[in-house]
Each structure stands twice: as structure tokens, then as C-alpha cells.
Amino acid sequence: HAINGGGDSNPGYDVILMKKGMLDIQAVGDIFAAPNGQLVFDAMKMADKGHGVLLLTLNYAGDQLAGKQAMKLARKAGLNVRQVVTGEEIRYDPNGEDNKRGLAGAVALYHIAAAAAREGKTLEEVAEIAQHYADNMASITVKSTDATHPQNGMSFGDLGETDLMEIGAGQHGEGGGVRVPMMSSKDTVATVAEALCKALDLKPGDKTFVMINGCGATTMMEMLVLFKDTVEFLKAKGIEVVASMVGEILTVQEAAGFQMNIAKWDEEMLRLWNTPCRTPAFSKE
């Protein structure tokens, strides 16, 4: 069984995770706050049916702390547990810190891991598949306006007051990226996709999964234009897109922009991806 723990500040994310073909349990914290370790441990106990539990965690300080506490409690209680941490963000600012934050790419990983578990693979095998996936994906966030806090409406920054966009802004607008003048979709995609291809060492003939995730205030039309430009950019390099996901998946309130996630796939990943999945926000038959 697979579980995840994280703060409750990403509309769309919580509902897309649960039910058939995804996670079994989500341990949810308060708004912009990670759950505590005890809550994550309680979720692990609920998920445990005798075959082990895989804890999937995005690389944020609070989530990591809760995960470590929960893993310690679980081992003390004699549970068979493993943990995989996703941190696929690549550093765009050459002078910035290499934070490796976990972004929307984790959602595809959740389905891959869940599919492997449903096939009856052991906990060790599922954890290995999840870790392999985590090691072969990369993401960048581009923001043009900052998120607002749902409890007080305050903006997290001043990006919306400028004519700039930030490449490498992080999920919640934590910053650490580079602010540049607004560009067209095609030019933005060329900048971002080139960086991701370099990070993954993609070569002609490689198979990839592409996700365009809206940050919260991005229209479907905008996301589809970005996706089209991404597919064309990769095709020109001889890189095949074998699967994709486009939509508002991991968001923050009123943030305009997108995340691009590219994962390097093999036939096993594609086979697992093509298994059924049914959640309130994401279904595959």
C-alpha cells in the first residue's frame, strides 16, 4: 500500500491522489503546513495489510521531518516500511541553491507505483520502481503571478506587479529562480525544455512522459498551447513523447504559470502507466 503526507494548500492535488490506481491514504496537514509525524504514522498503520507500506514524500522541510518521524515510529512498531522522496526540480539559476524541491511529477510516479503494487510486486520491488522513476524525471516551474494565501488573501510576492516571469520559482513561489521579461509560449518552452533535456541527458530515440501542470490560474487553452510547443520541440530533437498529462494538477491559489515535467521512460513504465486508474479528478481505463 502507498501513502503520501503533505500540507493542504494545493487545490486539486488531494482529490487526484485517492482511490483505484493511485494512493491508498493521504495524510493531510493544515493550510501551508505539513502533517505531523504521528498523523503520517497513523496513516501508515491504517494502510498496512501485512504486505508493507511505501511512504512517498515530496522534498520539503516539513514533509521530510514528518516522514522521518513517521518512519521511526513505524519501525519501532514493527511495520515493514520503505520511503521514497521526490525532488525533481532542477536548478535554473546558476547562482541559486540546488534545493531539489518536489513538484507535480510525483503524481505520475504515484500511479506507476500503485500499478506495480496492484500487480503483486513486493514492497522492495515497488520502492525500487518508484525510486527509479524519481531519479529519471525533472521539472521546472514558470510563474507570472504569485499565489495568494486562502486564509487572508495576501500575495506571496510582488511578481504580479511586474512585466516579468520567474523561471524556477518553485511550487508556492518560494523563489530561487531567475526573473526574465515575458516570452511567447514557444520561446518559453524552448528555454525550459532545453534545460530539462540537458538534466535528463535525453538523446534522439529516447521515450518520454510530458506533464504540463497549471499553477492555479492558468487556462486549459494556455496549457494545451504549451504542451503542443513542448511536443514539437522534443520531436525536433528526435525525442518521442509516449504519454502525457495536461491540467491543473498540483496548484496554489491564484498563481499564474505552469510546471513542465519530463520523465525518461522505458517500456515497463509505459506498461504500468497504461493500467486502469480512477480518482475524482483523474481517470484512465
Range-by-range predicted roles:
Residues 1-285:
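N-terminal loops that bind phosphate or other acidic moieties
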